[in-house]
Design a protein with these regions (language model features):
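Short N-terminal "domain-start" leader segments
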Residues: 1-21, 53
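Short linear motifs in intrinsically disordered/low-complexity regions
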Residues: 21, 30-31, 50
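A short, exposed loop/beta-hairpin motif centered on an aromatic-Gly-Thr core
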Residues: 29-43, 58
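Stable alpha-helical structural segments in soluble proteins, enriched in small hydrophobic residues
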Residues: 44-48
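Short arginine-rich
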Residues: 49-59
Length: 59
């Protein structure tokens, strides 16, 4: 019997740490694959999105 393909579900999370510090994570099933810290929410979202697209383009 053939194995069923299970697509990966990746998501970007942006988490407030302090008023001037935000953590971004690219996660699969609540497991962080890549993470980083930024000083604004907008920058954290952009960096998280960029990391997600780099992972997707790598295959």
């Amino acid at each position: 019997m053939a194995q069923r393909y299970r697509p990966r579900l990746l998501e970007v999370k942006v988490i407030p740490i302090k008023p001037d510090q935000w953590e971004w994570q690219v996660c699969e099933d609540d497991t962080p694959l890549v993470m980083g810290y930024e000083t604004t929410r907008e920058t954290a979202q952009i960096k998280g999105d960029s990391a997600l697209f780099r992972l997707l383009s790598a295959g």
